[in-house]
Amino acid sequence: MSDPSMTSDGATTHSGFVAIVGKPNVGKSTLLNSFLGTKVAPTSPRPQTTRRGVRGISTTDTHQIVFVDTPGLHKPKDALGKYMNHEVHSALADVDVIIWVVDLRHPPTDEDELVARQVRELPKPLFLVGNKTDAAKYPDEAMKLYRAQLEGRSAETSEIMLSAQNNPLQVATLREQILDILPENPFFYPRGAASDQSRETWAAEIIREEAMKKLREELPYAVATRVNRWTEREDGLQRIEGEIVVEKNAHKGMVIGSGGKQLREIGQAARKQLEVFLDRKVFLGLEVIVIPGWREDEEALRELGYE
């Protein structure tokens, strides 16, 4: 019987799970997408864009990294927020390596301390990644403050600083350092896999990303998305039917906009993204529905995939 931790030519394989953690809006999802060279996680300038733990997979001949992009750790205000924090705690319990991303434009906040408290005692290698150095006035001084939050940590800790655009050489350096410490294991996913998300979940997240970019004030946080149907015509056209879910009828009108303008703009932007990544023509049909108080309704959360 062949050894699952060896390649066909007898080389030993290494693989492991790497959690990317940090407070909201520090660049975790952008870093994940940079590692993979493709988009598997939604990004936007707004905090709490990521709600689920998203797994992105990077495989070489002998190594496989399973990155776990996590929601920003924060003080939850509703059942959705509690779910998001649970995703972080679950990821940290099951991974081999931790990446803590911090924003060097600002000194540590209470939310950063929440993250530090989680990772300080974990006996796992940790990379402290100082992000957005090119936009920071005093990046070295800020890095010292974040480093101080890990005081007393006994497990191995390394540091790296990244520009806001995630310079490819900097990202490659960090990736090589992770590869060097992966444990000996068989691969967890097939070669060529980029993510464990279903295509429906991935498309729904792209729709939500575009909605978050377009909508104002607190409304983006009261929006969820799902894809109910995805079919392919003989000519290759991808027909995707999705829903944007809001909590109130007033919100529905705001998402649709005057004469349907806002909804059309969200749909057009999402369709363009989908066409680029799928390399196919896409028809995207969107409907706005109301599920009252869905962020506090555990059954509704499960129906929307937050489980």
UniProtKB/Swiss-Prot annotation:
Binding site for GTP: 22-29, 69-73, 131-134
Any matching Pfam family: MMR_HSR1
InterPro entries assigned to the protein according to its UniProt record, in alphabetical order: G_ERA_dom, GTP-bd, GTPase_Era-like, KH_dom-like_a/b, KH_dom_type_2, KH_sf_prok-type, P-loop_NTPase, Small_GTP-bd
Cellular compartments annotated: Cytoplasm; Cell membrane
Region described as G1: spans on this chain: 22-29
UniProt-listed GO biological process terms: ribosomal small subunit assembly
Residue span(s) of domain Era-type G: 14-184
Location of region: G3: 69-72
Region G5: start-end pairs: 162-164
Entry's Gene Ontology cellular component terms: cytosol; plasma membrane
Sorted UniProt keywords: Cell membrane, Cytoplasm, GTP-binding, Membrane, Nucleotide-binding, Ribosome biogenesis, RNA-binding, rRNA-binding
Principal subcellular localisation of the protein: cytoplasm
Ranges for region G2: 48-52
Source organism, top-level taxon: Bacteria
Region G4, residue ranges: 131-134
Subunit details: Monomer.
Protein's job: An essential GTPase that binds both GDP and GTP, with rapid nucleotide exchange. Plays a role in 16S rRNA processing and 30S ribosomal subunit biogenesis and possibly also in cell cycle regulation and energy metabolism.
Protein family: Belongs to the TRAFAC class TrmE-Era-EngA-EngB-Septin-like GTPase superfamily. Era GTPase family.
Protein name, as recorded: GTPase Era
Top-level taxonomy: Bacteria, Thermotogati, Deinococcota, Deinococci, Deinococcales
Gene, per the UniProt record: era
